[in-house]
């Protein structure tokens, strides 16, 4: 009986998490101005921090700093 109750609570929590996530992505999709500012990025010059994401650099190579 207790196991059933725990499983039911777990399913309800997971369902609530999925609904919250779906609602957030729908909110971003409905606001074009917010979506465009999130997708638009300036590129970093040589020597600036980029982590390991080459999309942040104006060039194509990135290893913690733009090359």
From Swiss-Prot:
Its main location: secreted. Disulfide bonds join 43-58, 50-62, 57-66. Pfam families: Conotoxin (PF02950). It is found in: Secreted. Residues 1-24 form the signal peptide. Expressed by the venom duct. Residues 25-39 form a propeptide. InterPro entries: Conotoxin (IPR004214). It comes from the Eukaryota. Keywords: Cleavage on pair of basic residues, Disulfide bond, Knottin, Neurotoxin, Secreted, Signal, Toxin. GO terms for molecular function: ion channel inhibitor activity; toxin activity. One of its GO terms (cellular component) is extracellular region. The presence of a 'disulfide through disulfide knot' structurally defines this protein as a knottin. Belongs to the conotoxin O1 superfamily. This is Conotoxin Cl6.7.
């Amino acid at each position: 009986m207790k196991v059933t109750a725990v499983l039911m609570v777990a399913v309800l929590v997971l369902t609530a998490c999925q609904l919250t996530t779906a609602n957030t992505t729908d909110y971003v999709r409905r606001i074009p101005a917010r979506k465009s500012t999130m997708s638009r990025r300036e590129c970093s010059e040589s020597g600036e921090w980029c982590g390991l994401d080459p999309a942040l650099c104006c060039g194509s190579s990135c290893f913690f700093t733009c090359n």
